[in-house]
Every structure is written in C-alpha cells, then in structure tokens.
Amino acid sequence: MNRNFSQMITVRCSDPQLLCDMLAEWDLAQATTDIMGYMGTRVLADREKMGRYVIIADFGVVDPSVSAADEAARNNARPETRAFSVRMREVLDDDPEFHHFDEIYRTDR
C-alpha cells in the first residue's frame, strides 16, 4: 500500500516571519522543478511555548514503485534541498528536531 509521508521538523526561531518567507520562497522555486512527490509545507506555531514552531512537509506517491517516504529521501538528497537546509539553520535558534510519519488516515479522501 502506498501512503503519503510527512516529515515533521520542530524548530525554535526568534523570527518566524523570516522562516515563513524562506519557506514560501522554497515553495515558489519548487513549483517549476521536479519536486519528487513534494506536496507542500505547513508551519504551526506552538501556543504554549512561544518561539517554537512545527514545520510539516508532505510528500505523496508519484511512481507506485517508489514510496512517498523514498520520494522524500530523494528530495532530501538534492543539492537544492541541502543548500536550503543550511540557510534555514542559520535563522533557527537551535538545532531542528526531525520526525517521520506515514499517513494512515485522511478525511479528504
């Protein structure tokens, strides 16, 4: 069974607008390239811990023989993604924390 995949990145950032601007720039750049299953990103602000944010990057299946998680791994290996990761770390207050999830249920199907 092919499932969507989400990478959750928990970060601390003193300038969330800059973080969101960078992610919007990333999304715009990805709209014109081979994005390897990339479906989009959401940024959530923690209501209980100011300055803490969760970035959720969603990936879907493009080729039925390649899982969405493998699509995400391919995306992470791209030079553009690695360069963006370096830039993003420069605006963070601490190292990001990564978590990986397979989608098992979705209401909009």
Regions found by a protein language model. Name each.
Residues 1-2, 109:
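Basic/polar N-terminal segments that are highly enriched at the extreme N-terminus
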Residues 51-53, 63-66, 107-108:
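Short catalytic/ligand-binding loop motif for oxyanion handling, primarily in non-cytosolic enzymes
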Residues 44-50:
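A short beta-turn/loop motif at secondary-structure boundaries
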Residues 15-17, 47, 61-63:
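Feature marks short, surface-exposed loop/turn motifs that line or immediately flank catalytic pockets
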Residues 28-40, 58-99:
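An amphipathic, aromatic/His-enriched active-site/gating alpha helix that lines ligand/cofactor pockets
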Residues 4-12, 54-56:
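Active-site-flanking beta-strand signature of metal-NTP-handling nucleotidyl enzymes
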Residues 11-23:
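Short, surface-exposed ligand-recognition loops at beta-strand->loop->(often short) alpha-helix junctions
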Residues 99-109:
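Short, low-order "capping/linker" segments at domain edges
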